[in-house]
Amino acid sequence: ICFRCGLYFLVSCTFSNQPYISPDSVERNTAYNTRYVANILGGKEFNVGDNNVIALNLKLSTTGGRYLTPIDLEASAAAGRTIYDESQAYTQLQDAYFRMDVRLSYRMELGASTMEFSLDLQNVTNNQNVFTQSYNPRTGGITTEYQQGFFPVPTFRWTF
């Protein structure tokens, strides 16, 4: 890879196991025991004229799925709100989290200041990553809430 050519990359990966012993002496997962986290970042900068740069960047992120506590449907229906089955705390494994972000930017060097226009396309694949689940008293079922889907973020930055 030619870093002087405006290329960069970074790869990181972490493996872990984070159980705990519950008050009933059972080893359980925590909500955040995702078992692994991996990131890949890369990008390329292209010089345009003497003082301008166009950059294209990519970020891939994944983690093992989160553990949730199952909802007790009968108890939830009787109470009219979400009641969790605490005897099964953090036993329900969700799908792995995945997100891909793309960023395109144009930077102008203006003597003592810099102007940058960029467009971040967050979760460009619109992957539906589970955030939480709750009881819905209207339907009598479980509603799944997801993390942010595709989200474009235009930015203007002037540094002086």
Which positions does each model-derived feature cover?
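Short sequence motifs at beta-strands and strand-loop junctions characteristic
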Residues: 3, 30-36, 90-98, 146-150
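Generic secretory/membrane-interface signal
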Residues: 33, 39, 45, 95, ...
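Gram-negative outer-membrane beta-barrel transporters
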Residues: 1-66
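Glycan-recognition and catalytic regions of carbohydrate-active enzymes
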Residues: 84
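Extracellular loop and loop/strand-boundary signature of outer-membrane beta-barrel proteins
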Residues: 21-30, 87-91, 139-144
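Intrinsic disorder/low-complexity detector
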Residues: 35, 41, 87, 103, ...
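N-terminal start-of-chain detector that recognizes signal peptides
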Residues: 14-15, 28-32, 75-77, 90-93, ...
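C-terminal beta-signal and adjacent terminal beta-strands/loops
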Residues: 60-81, 97-101, 106-160
